[in-house]
Amino acid sequence: MDGKQGGMDGSKPAGPRDFPGIRLLSNPLMGDAVSDWSPMHEAAIHGHQLSLRNLISQGWAVNIITADHVSPLHEACLGGHLSCVKILLKHGAQVNGVTADWHTPLFNACVSGSWDCVNLLLQHGASVQPESDLASPIHEAARRGHVECVNSLIAYGGNIDHKISHLGTPLYLACENQQRACVKKLLESGADVNQGKGQDSPLHAVARTASEELACLLMDFGADTQAKNAEGKRPVELVPPESPLAQLFLEREGPPSLMQLCRLRIRKCFGIQQHHKITKLVLPEDLKQFLLHL
């Protein structure tokens, strides 16, 4: 049963060296302990907080890692187990530990979509900027549609327009995977609506998915319908000519209205993650809602 104490029959409590099937390459009582897999990892990945407490009290290293540099904190975050994350951080777990695949605990929390774990890690100093472009937390959260995680990363200074060569921007990934909530959050927070992947814009990505809703959203935020990708094609040229999306593109191909231009300019003046200040402007409520895309 989870939480069972070793040594209840009077014997010595089970410790790290009582598991001969685990290959330990250094002293497991030290913070740089290495193993193929340990009971600490097992407890963390399954969210067994009582077992985790017992193992720590028996001398197991909080920062024990596998040959691929995976720590118990990585596993707890991947499983979205907030209670285990709290225990590990309380006992000194390395919040910015990096695996052989460049995954950090924060990246794993974004994979699982655990907003609570993301916030706790950020409060304990987790870096929002990735150690490598192979594992970017904000890109992973946007791709999977974890909008609350995206919001927290932005609030802690995450680069909303970080462009990775093989992925593009967070906005591009959200569009490519049709994650509407994340697309809206990124746009509302000031993401560049025309920055995508290479010469592909987010609107090109949306054209391929044939999403009218996302196309409208991007164009409302100023997406360039005339932008050409590496093949010299505009978004409208990526959809069937008679499709509803093609008709929508044709309707929006003309120059934007003065009202739309004013909205885009005012929002740009406020900058990233500052649009909430629009509510403080001395303007009619209807106009504020227009500026906020409400």
Curated annotation (Swiss-Prot):
Q: Where is this site: Essential for binding to CKB?
A: H103, F107
Gene Ontology MF term list: ubiquitin-like ligase-substrate adaptor activity
Q: Which residues carry this modification: Phosphoserine?
A: S51
Q: Which GO terms describe its cellular component?
A: Cul5-RING ubiquitin ligase complex; cytosol; mitochondrion
Q: Which GO terms describe its biological process?
A: intracellular signal transduction; positive regulation of protein catabolic process; proteasome-mediated ubiquitin-dependent protein catabolic process; protein ubiquitination
Tissues in which the protein is found: Predominantly expressed in testis, kidney, and liver.
Keyword Coiled coil: yes or no? no
| Keyword terms of this UniProt record | Acetylation, ANK repeat, Mitochondrion, Phosphoprotein, Repeat, Ubl conjugation pathway
Q: Where in the cell is it found?
A: Mitochondrion
Q: What Gene3D superfamilies does its record include?
A: Ankyrin repeat-containing domain, SOCS box
Q: Which residues form the signal peptide?
A: none
Record-listed N-acetylmethionine modification sites: M1
Origin: domain of life: Eukaryota
Subunit structure, as described in the record: Substrate-recognition component of the ECS(ASB9) complex, composed of ASB9, CUL5, ELOB, ELOC and RNF7/RBX2.
The entry's function note states: Substrate-recognition component of a cullin-5-RING E3 ubiquitin-protein ligase complex (ECS complex, also named CRL5 complex), which mediates the ubiquitination and subsequent proteasomal degradation of target proteins. The ECS(ASB9) complex catalyzes ubiquitination of creatine kinases CKB and CKMT1A.
Identification of the protein by name = Ankyrin repeat and SOCS box protein 9
- This protein's species is Homo sapiens
Task: Name the gene.
Answer: ASB9
